[in-house]
Structure formats: structure tokens, C-alpha cells
């Protein structure tokens, strides 16, 4: 084997572990303010770190103490002011310690309060025999509630990505640049306290509301709503709730 080919193979093999590790690196969400209502009736407030993969809260109180709160001990909580770092810059281009946090602009109205509820969850294992308390963000009113779980994942930016052709092509070979990807899972919270996974949101929502399915599709078309977008789907589920309530009131 000639020397250039050996060098190329060696370079590729050294980069593969880095790329693979970057695919599944989950990172917590940070919020500037929160109000957490515990199952014992107490209420705590402060900045909050949400570890979605662990269903765990870290709340920094006004006196600087940090409370670790598992989902089992939480009745409900609300957060506002999601904090992000400059996650589209590689470490060598800024001083992380001195760089002030900024509000995440991925979603509109970052400062609004975002309520969370706790439901028993089987982690989407169809044949699971047990569940555990887990956090779900509430996106609409009810009685059928649209729920969301978000996961922030650190991924490596491909070298071929056009976002990096200006100013960042000088980074050393083998040093990947990371960015934050947002994964979103949607569910329905039923009035009975269970949840329904929306693996294919349009199909599953229409299946849950069979009597209203035709009207829901018409409503979505009229208002240009996408069943796969959380904010859009919240409007559709609210409309489904109103249709059911109208039907119940006439019976």
C-alpha cells in the first residue's frame, strides 16, 4: 500500500470515533427563571437546568443553593428565558467563560412562560411492563393536551457545510465543530392521565379523533397548518377539543 493511501485511511479512521461520539451527546436545557410546584405542596423558584434524558431538575435558589429535584417529586413547573451559549462557534473562536449567555431564538416568544406536566411514561417501549414519571411540556389547553419532549443534541458540523466556508476553514484537521440540534417528540395527554405517542402526528391525531377527523383535515388546510409542527398541531388539537365539547353539549 502506498504512503498517500495509508495516510488517508489513517485520517479517516481517526475521525470516525469523533463523528460517532458527536451524534448522541445530549445536553441540558437552561432557563433564566422557573417556578416549581412539588408534590408535597412546596413551591421553589430560581434559574433551572432541565436534564430531559434523566427527567431531573437542578434549581438554583436565590441564596445560591442548588436543589436537585427528580420528576417523582414534581407536580408541575413553568420556565421562561431559555439560555443558550454561542453553540455555532467552535471553542477556539471564543472564550466560553467570558462569553455572556444569550436567549435561544430557535422558538418564538422565548420570554413567555412554558408550563410542564408530569406523566407516567414507558419511554416509547411498546411492550414495557412499567412506567416512570417524566416531564412533558404543555402546548395547549385541554381537556386533551398536546405534549412535547425536546432533546438538545450536540452534533458535528460536516466540513462540506457551506456555513463554515468563511473564517472557520482554518480549524485543525480532526477538530470537529459542534452545533446544537433539537429533537422533538409529540404526545397527547388524555383526560384519564395517560399519554399517546404521536409517532406519525397526522395519522395518530386523526385516529384519536375519528369523529372529528374530516373537520380537522379541513381546518388544517384552511389555515395552512402542518401536523408535524408543534405550534400548528396545538391549534388543531384545540379545535378538536372544541368540536367534541360542542357535540357533548348537544347530546
Which residues make up each language-model segment?
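Short beta-strand-centered aromatic/proline hotspots
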Residues: 45-48
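Short solvent-exposed loop/turn micro-motifs enriched in small/polar/acidic residues
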Residues: 27-29, 41, 179-181
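Bacterial N-terminal signal peptides
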Residues: 8-17
Amino acid at each position: 500500500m502506498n504512503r498517500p493511501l495509508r495516510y488517508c485511511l489513517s485520517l479517516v479512521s481517526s475521525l470516525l470515533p469523533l463523528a460517532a461520539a458527536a451524534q448522541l451527546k445530549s445536553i441540558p436545557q437552561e432557563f433564566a427563571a422557573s417556578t416549581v410546584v412539588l408534590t408535597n405542596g412546596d413551591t421553589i423558584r430560581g434559574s433551572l437546568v432541565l436534564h430531559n434524558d434523566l427527567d431531573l431538575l437542578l434549581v438554583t435558589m436565590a441564596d445560591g443553593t442548588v436543589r436537585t429535584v427528580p420528576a417523582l417529586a414534581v407536580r408541575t413547573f413553568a420556565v421562561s428565558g431559555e439560555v443558550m451559549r454561542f453553540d455555532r462557534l467552535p471553542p477556539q473562536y471564543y472564550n466560553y467563560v467570558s462569553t455572556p449567555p444569550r436567549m435561544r431564538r430557535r422558538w418564538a416568544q422565548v420570554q413567555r412562560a412554558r408550563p410542564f406536566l408530569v406523566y407516567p411514561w414507558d419511554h416509547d417501549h411498546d411492550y414495557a411492563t412499567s412506567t416512570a414519571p417524566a416531564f412533558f411540556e404543555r402546548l395547549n389547553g385541554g381537556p386533551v393536551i398536546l405534549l412535547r419532549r425536546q432533546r438538545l443534541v450536540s452534533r458535528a458540523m460536516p466540513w462540506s457545510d457551506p456555513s463554515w466556508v468563511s473564517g472557520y476553514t482554518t480549524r485543525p484537521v480532526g477538530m470537529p465543530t459542534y452545533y446544537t440540534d433539537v429533537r422533538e417528540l409529540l404526545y397527547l395527554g388524555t383526560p384519564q392521565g395517560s399519554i399517546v405517542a404521536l409517532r406519525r402526528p397526522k395519522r395518530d391525531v386523526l385516529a384519536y379523533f375519528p369523529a372529528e377527523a374530516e373537520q380537522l383535515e379541513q381546518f388544517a388546510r384552511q389555515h395552512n397548518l402542518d401536523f408535524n409542527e408543534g405550534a400548528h398541531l396545538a391549534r388543531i388539537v384545540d379545535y378538536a377539543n372544541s368540536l367534541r365539547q360542542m357535540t357533548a353539549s348537544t347530546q
